[in-house]
């Protein structure tokens, strides 16, 4: 007996053949043919989130006596398999589809319907006893389901991946700040010599940037935790029973362990995604901070003989195919590339967020994809940068001291005693003649050897006073 390679699925456009071993149905199959665009698939976190929505909706519909318990239980079980990632291979659709995410919502409805039918001993594609629209999509619309899945996926990834990764980086930078606090170095402003500080103080600034980034991102979570579910097509809640929105948000919170709530205004939740733009803005700010930190570290580690050479960075791999022995700041370069990608994602996401024409924003898959890519890249890069660079950074104290000793900006310590103009003249003369500050200061007769040695003490210039 020959096993059929396809089965016939139907929708309102008629029949279509689907691979027999695939759970998706007619609408997902049509999407595969209609949107042969790019290689970017719907993120696995969105697929998981759609499973969460479908499970929560089925549980609430059963509780409200709208869904037969046998059908509902099968939907819940099938949706849980989606949540667990067991059915990821059955979600083949690309990002570039209808802007409401309708095809992906129907992909979820069809997969869960067919898997539930299979669990109940029925025939896949028959839509009996579990219908993808009537049962799996009960009390829902793609217009509230996909935005809800967006918020679930983005919040979960921020909470479980990005914030822990940034904490990991902060801990390492803070440890370096404490380890380097005794090392006095010359500061630089406008890339030119400035007054001294400690290397630990410099690293404390990096640690503070990361800590502030975490706080700013956490401030945006309440917006992501507001869910559109229950607004259905245009925000009115048509075909969803009274109380469904609140109950389904409670179920989603219970399933995910994140304090999701129903959005107070469903018209805003469907037509605008300002909370996504706001949250990604904080992520973008974190990328700006990480770009600065990675840049500073690679410049401070430049050399080893002809650069600043204040830091020694871990040597992880050969750096050149032509120059033997060359080692490059590869982790810094990877981090800065990631940050540039996040900047680009922020521009795309900001524009997409502005396109809520009338009652619905139709850039949802793009917004979700860019947001989630930023979170994954920054999370991964933060861990990689920490483990393969930051923890192994060492100070080159001999180079740091040499640069400090020859800096002309130590003259700043004399200004309160001999005046700004006289101090500036000493610095310029020393630079012109190639002499030391001490020599030129004593030559002016404005300060004695004892006073110079008392006033120009780098260790006293790293704090107020």
From Swiss-Prot:
Its EC number is 4.2.1.2. The record marks 333 as: Important for catalytic activity. SUPFAM superfamilies: L-aspartase-like. It is an enzyme of class 4 (lyase). GO terms for molecular function: fumarate hydratase activity. Substrate binds at residues 100-102, 131-134, 141-143, 189, 321, 326-328. It is found in: Cytoplasm. It catalyses: (S)-malate = fumarate + H2O. Keywords: Cytoplasm, Lyase, Tricarboxylic acid cycle. The active site is at residues 190, 320. Pathway: Carbohydrate metabolism; tricarboxylic acid cycle; (S)-malate from fumarate: step 1/1. NCBIfam families: fumC_II, PRK12273.1. Involved in the TCA cycle. Catalyzes the stereospecific interconversion of fumarate to L-malate. Homotetramer. This is Fumarate hydratase class II.
